[in-house]
From Swiss-Prot:
GO biological process: glycine biosynthetic process from serine; tetrahydrofolate interconversion
Keywords recorded for this protein, A-Z: Amino-acid biosynthesis, Cytoplasm, One-carbon metabolism, Pyridoxal phosphate, Transferase
Annotated localization: Cytoplasm
Name this protein carries in UniProt: Serine hydroxymethyltransferase
Organism: Synechococcus sp. (strain WH7803)
Molecular function GO labels: glycine hydroxymethyltransferase activity; pyridoxal phosphate binding
Length: 429
């Protein structure tokens, strides 16, 4: 056997590439010792990471299961079929495509399947909690299509379905997008369906943020009401980073399959698809429902305690995992708040709030999410303590003693709720 010294295929990562191994180790330490409150992040299980870090990364498999352009696909066919069946069972869908590399790719495939350049679409304004792919002018969705953006009511900071209906009647969109990246309230998918039917529009639900809550029955499902549903597979679903498309109509299914491949992607990432299958299997277990219920209870506890400390929360609370702070109530910008909590090892992100006078690079809001820390085992009491730390830091930005105490409390919480305790990163095995 030839020994290729330049290709140490059996060497562990720490030996083969110590620089990358060291950086991965540092990132793991950061995740263990910081409080993760970014609403779009979560912690995948060791099983999910093991599947994603497997030999499946070696296999090329253009096409759909049992309709490949390459040989040797019998095992990845079985894996992808299992991922599809689990996704359908989890969300009550008639069809699923598990190949999109991301939620943005899933949305793009839907646009490619249903629309032509110049068609009119409606989506939630980014500054009101929407997403870049819902018609933002900096995204391809805002460049290819005529975009009509709807927003929330200025007083209630909630979706005004009658105002949305009037916009739809005026502009007659070909497709309406319902979904968000920073909207803390329940979405009435049935009301969106009625509007879409009235104007003859397709209805796309982007449930990327709430997919796990939908799977667990904690948030109403869009699947019975929408022509097509897209999602990411991480966030509240707690899987690998990736995308998913669901629908209930065989005619649409063929269009979406072709829009994914060959329309917008080449070979699927079968190692990621295997990890998706594992995550879907985990979400089908009874424990996942209890987890998702706790995610919402924790968000409500976080919001309540922050409001009690005098910090406004957009819409006055939350129905899901998102808590969006309106920092105008304490005379602070999101940019400053982001840096302040980061100094005490709390990870969040600045975010626009409805009718925000600040630029997207500054903002008046701070977006928080409870999915990741709930995975660590945080309960409502622990989140009330997290809220106290955040409030202490934001309300006393110049007090070094309070900053030091906040750091101590964060460290204590991290020790009480360890993440991958005593586990070995798959990449380092």
């Amino acid at each position: 056997m030839v020994d290729f010294e330049t290709a140490p295929i059996n060497a562990p990562l720490a030996e083969s590439d110590p620089a990358i191994a060291r950086l991965i180790d540092q990132e793991r330490d950061r995740q263990e010792t910081h409080l993760e409150l970014i609403a779009s992040e979560n912690f995948a299980s060791s099983a999910v990471m093991a599947a994603q870090g497997s030999v499946l990364t070696n296999k090329y498999a253009e096409g759909l299961p049992n309709k490949r352009y390459y040989g040797g696909c019998e095992h990845v066919d079985a894996i992808e079929d299992l991922a599809i069946e689990r996704a359908k069972e989890l969300f009550g869908a008639a069809w699923a495509n598990v190949q999109p590399h991301s939620g943005a790719q899933a949305n793009f495939a839907v646009f490619l399947a249903l629309l032509q350049p110049g068609d009119t679409i409606m989506g939630l304004d980014l500054s009101h909690g929407g997403h870049l792919t819902h018609g933002s002018p900096v995204n391809v969705s805002g460049k290819w299509f005529n975009v009509v953006q709807y927003g929330v009511d200025k007083e209630t900071q909630r979706l005004d379905m009658e105002a949305i209906r009037q916009l739809a009647l005026e502009h007659k969109p070909k497709l309406i997008v319902c979904g968000f990246s920073a909207y803390p309230r329940t979405i009435d998918f049935a009301a969106f369906r009625a509007i879409a039917d009235e104007v003859g529009a397709y209805l796309l639900a982007d449930m990327a943020h709430i997919a796990g809550l939908v799977a667990a029955g904690v948030h109403p499902s869009p699947v019975p009401h929408c022509d097509v549903v897209t999602t990411t597979t991480h966030k509240t679903l707690r899987g690998p980073r990736g995308g998913l498309i669901l629908c209930r109509d065989a005619e649409f299914a063929k269009k979406f399959d072709k829009a994914v491949f060959p329309g917008s992607q080449g070979g699927p990432l079968e190692h990621v698809i295997a990890a998706k299958a594992v995550a879907f299997g985990e979400a089908l277990r009874p424990a996942f429902k209890a987890y998702s219920q706790q995610v919402v209870a924790n968000a409500q506890a976080l919001a309540d305690r922050l409001m009690a400390r005098g910090i406004d929360v957009v819409s006055g609370g939350t129905d899901n995992h998102v808590v969006l702070l309106d920092l105008r109530s304490i005379g602070m910008t999101g940019k400053v708040a982001d840096l302040l909590v980061s100094d005490v090892h709390i990870t969040a992100n600045k975010n626009t709030v409805p009718f925000d006078p600040e630029s997207p690079f500054v903002t008046s809001g701070l977006r928080l999410g409870t999915a990741a820390l709930t995975t660590r085992g945080f309960d409502a009491d622990a989140f009330a303590e997290v809220a106290e730390v955040i409030a202490d830091r934001l309300l006393n930005p110049e007090d070094d003693a309070i900053q030091a105490r906040c750091l101590e409390r964060v460290a204590s919480l991290c020790r009480r709720f360890p993440l991958y305790a005593m586990a070995t990163e798959p990449a380092l095995v």
